[in-house]
Amino acid sequence: MSPQTETKAGVGFKAGVKEYKLTYYTPEYETKDTDILAAFRVTPQPGVPPEERGAAVAAESSTGTWTTVWTDGLTSLDRYKGRCYHIEPVPGEEDQFIAYVAYPLDLFEEGSVTNMFTSIVGNVFGFKALRALRLEDLRIPVAYVKTFQGPPHGIQVERDKLNKYGRPLLECTIKPKLGLSAKNYGRAVYECLRGGLDFTKDDENVNSQPFMRWRDRFLFCAEAIYKSQAETGEIKGHYLNATAGTCEEMIKRAVFARELGVPIVMHDYLTGGFTANTSLSHYCRDNGLLLHIHRAMHAVIDRQKNHGMHFRVLAKALRMSGGDHIHSGTVVGKLEGERDITLGFVDLLRDDYIEKDRSRGIYFTQDWVSLPGVLPVASRGIHVWHMPALTEIFGDDSVLQFGGGTLGHPWGNAPGAVANRVALEACVKARNEGRDLAAEGGEIIREACKWSP
């Protein structure tokens, strides 16, 4: 019998409960390039020292349990355990601190966001010794990044497919999002695309309801796409939501979209789940479909400031799981601090290499190596007068989504689309000429109105 598995009755082991910090708090630990690093915002129960709570997070999200078990002797805890290696207070917050935890790469299945989250956040958030816990950021090592396909195509390939360069893309969600027949829905799609938008979009909760079954919607939207392409000479698309109750049904809808020859489908990646999302992403790459991602349900996870997960973590996970676009919100009208934080995770979506910058909420330097980038989608209550700020803040590699800002135009859908396209092209032209969009934005839009049909 192997010495490692041999039962030694005369030796035994020291059973019982012991403090987590004795095993899992290791301030002397030097992190490895292959470690997954996590930054947790911890709010402990009163009277619990930070070192113990940080170590508890590391233990309960890796190899630990509430008591010592004899099977600990059958493996190497030093190789597999998570380690809380640094603790720092949160400025301006009483009794909150950031616990930094390092996880050995062997704890995670290759290419599985599902397994990564199951390990890191699957159980520890219900730990009664903590009042609240929030995952602020993750550092994904290059060795783990390379096990993921990532976005089906990425920013450059999408631009090449669409033959559209040098400006943000324009998009509109069809409203009302529920209740339209498939034919009337397709009519609205045609009017918006014919007016000058690049894309229209299913709302996140449009799947296959009694008033509009998915196959009918796909057919009428495809007709609208082809008609608007023939009349404008531009490549158009509609985000056909393939989200369904089963993975098999989701793939069936994506297959039908491919057979129709449309360029893009859509998925609700949080409600649909990471396993389904990764499967759809792989299908889209293999079959030449772009993949738009909606983040429905994200606020359930990321809205609380001291519990849950920050959206930057969900954004990183999406880039690994796969998607060519994802909604990122917008910074127009928000506080400057929120602007910096939002643009921080926008850079995490688009760029290849992002330096640590705590002022923007980036706790770790992240190297994505060759993983394609994701286009952020700016949405939520924006309209044509926001165009100068959006053009300046988000730059060319973005999608600007005007729902009510298109369909709410007093002259109708097509004029609303025309207004957005004219405003965008005017702002891009002014920017390229060196004009100050922040100072002259209103004047630029008014000048464009004079020549708009």
Swiss-Prot record:
InterPro entries per record: RuBisCO, RuBisCo_large_chain_AS, RuBisCO_lsu_C, RuBisCO_lsu_C_sf, RuBisCO_lsu_fd_N, RuBisCO_lsu_N_sf, RuBisCO_lsuI
Chief location bin: plastid
The keyword Plastid is assigned to this record: yes
Superkingdom of origin: Eukaryota
SUPFAM superfamilies recorded: RuBisCo, C-terminal domain, RuBisCO, large subunit, small (N-terminal) domain
Binding-site list for Mg(2+): K201, D203, E204
Positions carrying N6,N6,N6-trimethyllysine: K14
Cofactor requirement: Mg(2+)
UniProt KW keywords: Acetylation, Calvin cycle, Carbon dioxide fixation, Chloroplast, Disulfide bond, Lyase, Magnesium, Metal-binding, Methylation, Monooxygenase, Oxidoreductase, Photorespiration, Photosynthesis, Plastid
Annotated positions binding substrate: N123, T173, K177, R295, H327, S379
Propeptide: 1-2
Catalytic activity reported: 2 (2R)-3-phosphoglycerate + 2 H(+) = D-ribulose 1,5-bisphosphate + CO2 + H2O; D-ribulose 1,5-bisphosphate + O2 = 2-phosphoglycolate + (2R)-3-phosphoglycerate + 2 H(+)
Additional comment: The basic functional RuBisCO is composed of a large chain homodimer in a 'head-to-tail' conformation. In form I RuBisCO this homodimer is arranged in a barrel-like tetramer with the small subunits forming a tetrameric 'cap' on each end of the 'barrel'.
Function: RuBisCO catalyzes two reactions: the carboxylation of D-ribulose 1,5-bisphosphate, the primary event in carbon dioxide fixation, as well as the oxidative fragmentation of the pentose substrate in the photorespiration process. Both reactions occur simultaneously and in competition at the same active site.
Name of the protein this chain belongs to: Ribulose bisphosphate carboxylase large chain
Annotated source species: Valantia muralis
Lineage: Eukaryota, Viridiplantae, Streptophyta, Embryophyta, Tracheophyta
Encoding gene (name): rbcL
